[in-house]
From Swiss-Prot:
Record PROSITE patterns: CHAPERONINS_CPN10 (PS00681)
GO MF term list: ATP binding; metal ion binding; protein folding chaperone; protein-folding chaperone binding; unfolded protein binding
Organism: Colwellia maris
GO biological process: chaperone cofactor-dependent protein refolding
Protein known as: Co-chaperonin GroES
S-S pairs: none
Pfam families assigned to the protein according to its UniProt record, in alphabetical order: Cpn10
Compartment list: Cytoplasm
InterPro entries: Chaperonin_GroES (IPR020818), Chaperonin_GroES_sf (IPR037124), Chaprnonin_Cpn10_CS (IPR018369), GroES-like_sf (IPR011032)
One GO CC term, this protein: cytoplasm
Length: 96
């Protein structure tokens, strides 16, 4: 897949959601929630500040992240794979 996001945008691939409940029951279809964990597959050059400088992003390709699904998150299919395009500010944490 060859795609390059602009500015402070990040492209992530969602991790599969857990398909079992806490009690061990296998969940089917719409009973499983979409995961808010993802792997970063591409990052932009950085955020352009008011003074014209570019602040590099804190995330890098390969990082495992937790993100907020909100208004600015865009779902796209690229090369047959579903990816999410979001701003770095939509990322809540990097899983270490």
């Amino acid at each position: 897949m060859s795609i390059r996001p602009l500015h402070d945008r990040v492209i992530v691939k969602r991790k599969d959601a857990e398909s079992k409940s806490e009690g061990g029951i296998v969940l089917m279809g719409s009973a499983t929630e979409k995961s808010t964990r993802a792997e970063v597959i591409a990052v932009g050059n950085g955020r352009i500040l008011e003074n014209g400088e570019v602040r590099p992003l804190d995330v890098k390709v390969g990082d495992q992240v937790i993100f907020s699904e909100g208004y600015g998150v865009k779902t796209e299919k690229i090369d047959g794979e579903e990816v999410l395009i979001l701003s770095e500010s939509d990322i809540l944490a990097i899983v270490e």
